[in-house]
A protein has these predicted regions:
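Short, flexible loop segments at the rims of nucleotide/cofactor-binding pockets, characterized by
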Residues: 85-90, 114, 185-186
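Residue-level marker of regulatory loop/turn positions in helix-turn-helix DNA-binding domains and
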Residues: 91, 112, 144
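Conserved phosphate-coupling serine/threonine residues in phosphotransfer and NTP-handling enzymes
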Residues: 12, 113-115
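N-terminal helical cap/lid subdomain that shapes the substrate entry/recognition surface
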Residues: 2-97, 105
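Low-complexity, intrinsically disordered short peptide segments enriched in small/polar/basic residues
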Residues: 17, 108-109, 173, 212
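Asp-based, Mg2+/Mn2+-dependent phosphohydrolase catalytic module
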Residues: 1-3, 64, 100-103, 117, ...
Length: 224
């Protein structure tokens, strides 16, 4: 039996790509009109702390004071999400069934996300996913965020397990880097916005192409 299976949220359990991209578009139109980064550049920030991503993007677009501008952009971004969150997200098909099966087998499950607790919990509650998780770590809970391992280490601490006994499952390179840094086994899912080649370069321990394969992970990675 696995000691702990930890999941990223956005792009792994819940499809939030449209919400995130539209939030960025609205925010840049308000603060840096005509300078919206490419979809590829925006997707590359997925999985990171939003404040850090906005600072980096603002600097790349020539902002004279990226720190101050990013703070203003953050307010606009979150205002948009509050208004449109529930209508622009959906669960990935098969995710609820996979979580239910793992939970029924007695595996302990957790969520580790760079998302603020309010929005993260709302997304899980909308699709009745929260009941499967024994532990959750949100942006608000730590001072350093993925790809730093702190959020994953905090989840292991709360669960009372050694990090090496845990698996971290995510859709981004930042997830894989964070998991490896935390000495956890890592799994990349292929139904998110990242290309397979990009994820392969991060060297996860396993890759899965459909949620049904998640149920096989404890056996596949020989976790006891």
């Amino acid at each position: 039996m696995s000691d702990l299976l930890l999941f990223d949220l956005d792009g792994t359990l819940v499809d939030t790509t449209d919400l995130i991209l539209q939030s960025f578009a609205w925010t840049f139109d308000a603060h840096l009109p005509g300078r919206l980064p490419s979809r590829r550049d925006l997707v590359a920030t997925f999985g990171r702390s939003l404040p850090a991503a906005l600072r980096e993007l603002a600097a790349e677009q020539g902002a004279t004071d990226p720190e101050a501008l990013a703070a203003e952009m953050l307010v606009t971004y979150r205002d948009f999400q509050r208004q449109h969150h529930d209508t622009l997200i959906q669960p990935f098909p098969g995710i609820a069934d996979a979580l239910a099966a793992l939970h029924a087998e007695g595996h302990r499950l957790g969520v580790v996300t760079s998302k603020m607790q309010h929005f993260a919990r709302r997304g899980m509650q909308l699709f009745d996913l929260e009941r499967y998780f024994d532990v959750a770590v949100f942006h608000d809970d730590v001072t350093r965020h993925k790809p730093h391992p702190e959020p994953l280490l905090e989840a292991a601490r709360r669960a009372g397990v050694e990090p090496s006994s845990a698996i971290y499952i995510g859709d981004s390179t930042h997830d894989i880097v964070a998991g490896r840094a935390a000495a956890m086994r890592t799994v990349a899912v292929l139904w998110g916005p990242f290309d397979r080649e990009v994820l392969e370069a991060a060297r996860p321990d396993a890759m899965v192409s459909s949620p049904s394969e998640l149920v096989e992970l404890p056996t596949r990675l020989q976790v006891r």
